[in-house]
């Protein structure tokens, strides 16, 4: 009887309740963008913040014997960033410990060393696809600031293969967007297929895309794919305006906005007007300008905003203070890059992707942007539509649990009633036997 009771309790009450609690926890879990701390130390926050918005963390096994290394899979570049020995990381790839490591070539580009080597690689993607690579060529970049410690293969996922961005789909499950991708083959032969014209009829575009056309450029190390967009003006704080028409390039590799160097003069006025401190670092003929202020200077920069505008095509992108600046420790940062050697471009970092996503329509072959609303920015919150679905699912699960408990109690009542009758019959039999024995004893006497 005790064993049967334990069995019924475990399978009919405890197990359903446990499974339901796990389901509820999964739905209620806030997708934290800083879960990387279980892989990396907290000191690597700036490095992670720079890459996280269009890449996501996963694990790979590399080398023989296997070394389990956390890294960032970049769907846009079809490449993989992992921590090297030069990074302040708890785990890094050490080729000296791998029997299958083979150096193919080594080249120096200023302060950057590019290694081409082969080794054994295995990792799972989307929890459904795994890659096993041997004798595959990897590229390793070692930079002074450790911002990129290593890059594994620009064609890691195969030629022409579109790669789903799990982070975007997981956090932003819009009803009108089911399958959107933004990864492309980096073969120059296929660039003609990606030169899509801008969708002028934006007002009648029910899904709210802003489509742009592609262009490309390359350097000595690798080829990049950028998406260009022309602007009539750039408003800063709704007053200072950069009115000269310019072309901004939105680089899906690093989530950057690249524009004309003439913007630098305008931006210098902004620094002077707001009395903003700027730390300038000269690295390989490129100036990295880190603009930062202490927390008490929030009010000073609260009206800081940039607006990219095109009148005839009726589109604009606005970045305000909360989009441009992000907090690391006790400082507020805005990263601006200016190329000092050629004076050809300025570059904003990842804050753009806090407000706008790159999306790709696989059916119609369009790439574009979609804007986040305030409830759905990359802060780990889920879409309200998903919250409604979550509530419905939890409600159904709770009803199922209640039904299971009622059925369990009902069957328990029936079993208990039957056992009560059995025990009562046995008791009556014992009483009759006792009476019979008593009468027999009296007769014998």
Task: Tell what function each PLM region has.
Residues 60-62, 70-75, 80-82, 151, ...:
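Short hydrophobic beta-strand that contains or immediately precedes a catalytic carboxylate
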Residues 68, 72-100, 255-283, 413-415:
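Classical protein tyrosine phosphatase
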Residues 57, 112, 118, 231, ...:
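Surface-exposed or flexible loop/turn and strand-edge residues in extracellular/cell-surface modules
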Residues 239-252, 256, 265-266, 305:
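Extended serine/threonine-enriched, polar tracts that run as long, contiguous segments within proteins
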Residues 21-34, 137-144, 197-200, 243, ...:
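Aspartic protease catalytic domain
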Residues 2-21:
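Cleavable N-terminal signal peptides of Sec/SRP-targeted secreted and luminal proteins
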Residues 21-51, 122-242, 331-337:
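Aspartyl protease catalytic domain
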Residues 37-42, 51-147:
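Signature of the N-terminal lobe/flap region of pepsin-like aspartyl proteases
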């Amino acid at each position: 009887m005790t064993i049967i009771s334990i069995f019924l309790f475990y399978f009919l009450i405890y197990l359903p309740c446990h499974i339901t609690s796990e389901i509820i926890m999964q739905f209620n879990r806030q997708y934290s963008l800083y879960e990387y701390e279980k892989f990396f130390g907290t000191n690597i926050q700036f490095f992670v913040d720079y890459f996280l918005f269009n890449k996501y963390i996963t694990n790979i096994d590399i080398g023989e014997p296997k070394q389990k290394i956390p890294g960032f899979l970049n769907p846009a570049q079809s490449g993989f960033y992992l921590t090297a020995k030069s990074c302040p990381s708890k785990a890094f790839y050490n080729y000296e410990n791998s029997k299958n490591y083979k150096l193919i070539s080594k080249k120096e580009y200023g302060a950057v060393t590019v290694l081409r080597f082969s080794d054994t690689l295995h990792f799972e993607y989307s929890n459904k696809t795994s890659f096993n690579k041997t004798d595959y060529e990897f590229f390793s970049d070692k930079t002074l600031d450790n911002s990129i410690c290593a890059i594994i293969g620009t064609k890691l996922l195969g030629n022409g293969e579109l790669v789903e961005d799990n982070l975007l789909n997981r956090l932003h499950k819009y009803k009108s967007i089911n399958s959107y991708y933004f990864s492309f083959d980096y073969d120059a032969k296929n660039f003609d297929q990606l030169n899509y014209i801008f969708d002028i009829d934006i007002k009648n575009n029910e899904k709210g895309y802003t489509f742009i056309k592609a262009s490309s450029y390359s350097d000595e190390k690798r080829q990049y794919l950028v998406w260009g967009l022309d602007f009539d003006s750039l408003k800063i704080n709704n007053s200072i305006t950069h009115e000269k028409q310019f072309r901004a390039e939105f680089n899906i590799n690093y989530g950057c906005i690249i524009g004309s160097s003439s913007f630098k003069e305008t931006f210098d006025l902004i620094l002077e007007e707001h009395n903003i401190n700027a730390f300038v670092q000269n690295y390989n003929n490129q100036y990295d300008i880190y603009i930062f202020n202490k927390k008490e200077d929030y009010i000073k920069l609260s009206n800081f905003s940039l607006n990219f505008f095109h009148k005839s095509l009726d589109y604009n992108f606005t970045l305000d203070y909360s989009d441009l600046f992000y907090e690391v420790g006790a400082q507020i940062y805005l990263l601006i890059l200016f190329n000092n050697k050629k004076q050809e471009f300025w570059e904003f970092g990842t804050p753009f992707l806090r407000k706008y996503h790159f999306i790709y329509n696989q059916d119609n072959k369009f790439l574009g942007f979609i804007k986040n609303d305030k409830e759905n920015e990359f802060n780990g919150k889920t879409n309200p539509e998903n919250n409604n679905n979550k509530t419905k699912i939890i409600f159904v699960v709770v009803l199922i649990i209640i039904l299971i408990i009622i059925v369990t109690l009902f069957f328990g009542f029936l079993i208990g009633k039957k056992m009560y009758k059995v025990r009562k019959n046995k008791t009556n039999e014992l009483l009759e036997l006792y009476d019979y024995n008593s009468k027999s004893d009296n007769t014998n006497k």
